């Protein structure tokens, strides 16, 4: 092992093996090797929307081979522009159809569909940072749920680029491009909030 004499030679980025050793009281994600502290406990609105969506999604996939998971659930993403095993996220909801991606630690690879429910403190991270991560890692579909304005954005991966559908608002039905039989009324997503 050689001596490090210059700050530029230090590797301050972390990997999944480091992540597994942490015992923080707060939840964190690892984004391209850098630690990102997550928001404290989600709001009641966030949790209600999460339960509503999870119920609808889980009911649809109950008789399918795909698996549905809710946070906290580690997803290790393959990011081409970062070191291997340097990105671990905890999406609000994710659907994984390839059993080979699942292990005892969570998901190792891009889920088929990820849902993020916006919170005031996480909206920039979910709309910007995670959008780019999910697109780069090959998540086929990404839903962003806006709880204050009550709409859902659906992005589908086409030629490695997310293409957005028009926002789905109350009175409309969310339709997945990758699971066309799954149709969820937006009013059901925001029930009881």
Protein language model features and the residues they cover:
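Gly/Pro/Ser/Thr-rich low-complexity, intrinsically disordered segments predominantly at protein N-termini
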Residues: 1-193
């Amino acid at each position: 092992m050689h001596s490090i004499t210059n700050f530029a030679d230090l590797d301050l980025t972390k990997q999944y093996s480091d992540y597994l050793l942490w015992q923080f009281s707060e939840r964190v994600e690892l984004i391209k090797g850098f630690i990102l502290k997550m928001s404290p406990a989600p709001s009641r609105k966030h949790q209600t929307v999460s339960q509503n969506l999870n119920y609808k999604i889980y009911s649809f996939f109950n008789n399918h081979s795909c698996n549905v998971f809710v946070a906290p659930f580690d997803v290790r993403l393959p990011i081409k522009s970062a070191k291997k095993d340097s990105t671990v996220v905890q999406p609000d909801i994710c659907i994984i159809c390839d059993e080979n991606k699942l292990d005892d630690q969570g998901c190792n690879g891009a889920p088929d569909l990820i849902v993020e429910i916006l919170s005031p403190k996480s909206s920039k991270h979910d709309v910007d940072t995670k959008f780019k991560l999910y697109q780069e890692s090959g998540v086929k579909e990404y839903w962003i749920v806006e709880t204050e304005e009550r709409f859902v954005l659906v992005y589908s991966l086409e030629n490695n680029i997310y293409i957005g559908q028009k926002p789905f608002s109350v009175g409309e039905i969310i339709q997945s491009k990758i699971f066309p039989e799954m149709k969820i009324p937006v009013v059901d997503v925001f029930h009881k909030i």
